[in-house]
Amino acid sequence: MSIAVGMIETLGFPAVVEAADSMVKAARVTLVGYEKIGSGRVTVIVRGDVSEVQASVTAGIENIRRVNGGEVLSNHIIARPHENLEYVLPIRYTEAVEQFREIVNPSIIRR
């Protein structure tokens, strides 16, 4: 299984909450965090199997449109991020989200 990273950058916090909620409901992914960029920009980050992350990002983008004033600024999926990224960028599975990772995919072996 290839673990991917999916990101959606939105304008406004309500839009990112809607994106995050719809992303984890639509596919077997784990929400690993969000980043406040500034000027109302917020990015939500999920991880999981490549196909699940693709479905998740698609659902997030579609549902942001339901939020009054919600706007998708950008989105991207990295299919197999280099492990060095985990140590520098906020895409790691932290202790706080590990329980949800196991629920999403109980066969995952912890590193």
Curated annotation (Swiss-Prot):
- List the GO terms this entry assigns under cellular component, sorted alphabetically: carboxysome
Q: Which InterPro entries match?
A: Bact_microcomp_CS, BMC_dom, BMC_shell, CcmK, CcmK-like_sf, CcmK/CsoS1_BMC
List the Gene Ontology MF annotations in alphabetical order: structural constituent of carboxysome shell
Q: What PROSITE patterns does this protein's entry cite?
A: BMC_1 (PS01139), BMC_2 (PS51930)
Q: What are the protein's UniProt keywords?
A: Bacterial microcompartment, Carbon dioxide fixation, Carboxysome, Photosynthesis
Superkingdom classification of source:
Bacteria
What residues does the BMC domain cover?
4-90
**Keyword Lyase included in the entry's annotation:** no
GO biological process assignments? carbon fixation; photosynthesis
Statement: the UniProt record of this protein carries the keyword Transcription:
no
UniProt subcellular location: Carboxysome
Query: Cross-referenced PANTHER family, in alphabetical order?
Result: CARBOXYSOME SHELL PROTEIN CCMK4, PROPANEDIOL UTILIZATION PROTEIN PDUA
- Domain comment, in the record's words? The tight homohexamer forms a pore with an opening of about 5.0 Angstroms in diameter which is positively charged. Sulfate ions are bound in one crystal form in both the pore and between hexamers which may represent metabolite flux. The C-terminal flexible tail, which is the most variable part of CcmK proteins, seems to be involved in packing of hexamers in layers.
What is the purpose of this protein? One of the shell proteins of the carboxysome, a polyhedral inclusion where RuBisCO (ribulose bisphosphate carboxylase, rbcL-rbcS) is sequestered. Assembles into hexamers which make sheets that form the facets of the polyhedral carboxysome. The hexamer central pore probably regulates metabolite flux. Probably the major shell protein of the carboxysome, a polyhedral inclusion where RuBisCO (ribulose bisphosphate carboxylase, rbcL-rbcS) is sequestered. The central pore probably regulates metabolite flux. Hexamers make sheets that form the facets of the carboxysome.
HAMAP family for the chain: CcmK
Q: Which family does it belong to?
A: Belongs to the bacterial microcompartments protein family. CcmK subfamily.
Its quaternary organisation is: Homohexamer. Interacts with full-length CcmM. Forms mixed heterohexamers of all possible stoichiometries with CcmK2, which might form dodecamers. Only very weak interactions with CcmK3 and CcmK4 were seen. Interacts with CcmN and CcmO in the carboxysome.
Its recorded name reads: Carboxysome shell protein CcmK1
